[in-house]
């Protein structure tokens, strides 16, 4: 299955949740697209579980095959499966760049990583799905510091709160990962237990 690259607002409306954060078009029309978008539909247990899984996938920009692998990895962890799944998703490098305020959206963060703008612990990384660990250090590469995306990030620093498990230091926009997040530190509007139930069938 190819990655969805169409209008995110349309997916937000279909799933009835803001997948971007601050999507004004969604706020104006928070109901599914199409001529029957406002009609009430009977929501089965399966539909609710499927929608929650799709919400998570589109929020983090992950394809189905990879998302299932994350779920299977979460099952093997000693903690609660749903919480471990969210922790895995949050530890992706593209998400860390978004959370640190270096990109306006996760989609933009994924593009910045793919274009090779970052080092992790001094090593060049251009894979958006790269997973960070506690005490990792993410740096903007020297040649990228004065490019437009990072100039904008410096100008807009502080507009969006940075989660407590991360710290952004100085004009070089160095990102320190103090820990991987606990569930209480993850603000995505998801009911992860529904995702667990979806895959448990």
From Swiss-Prot:
Residues 91-157 form the S4 RNA-binding domain. CDD domains: S4 (cd00165). One of its GO terms (cellular component) is peptidoglycan-based cell wall. GO terms for biological process: ribosomal small subunit biogenesis; translation. It holds the Pfam family S4. Keywords: Ribonucleoprotein, Ribosomal protein, RNA-binding, rRNA-binding. GO terms for molecular function: rRNA binding; structural constituent of ribosome. It comes from the Bacteria. PROSITE patterns: RIBOSOMAL_S4 (PS00632), S4 (PS50889). Belongs to the universal ribosomal protein uS4 family. Was identified as a high-confidence drug target. Part of the 30S ribosomal subunit. Contacts protein S5. The interaction surface between S4 and S5 is involved in control of translational fidelity. NCBIfam families: PRK05327.1 (NF003717), rpsD_bact (TIGR01017). One of the primary rRNA binding proteins, it binds directly to 16S rRNA where it nucleates assembly of the body of the 30S subunit. This is Small ribosomal subunit protein uS4. It comes from Mycobacterium tuberculosis (strain ATCC 25618 / H37Rv). The lineage of its organism: Bacteria, Bacillati, Actinomycetota, Actinomycetes, Mycobacteriales.
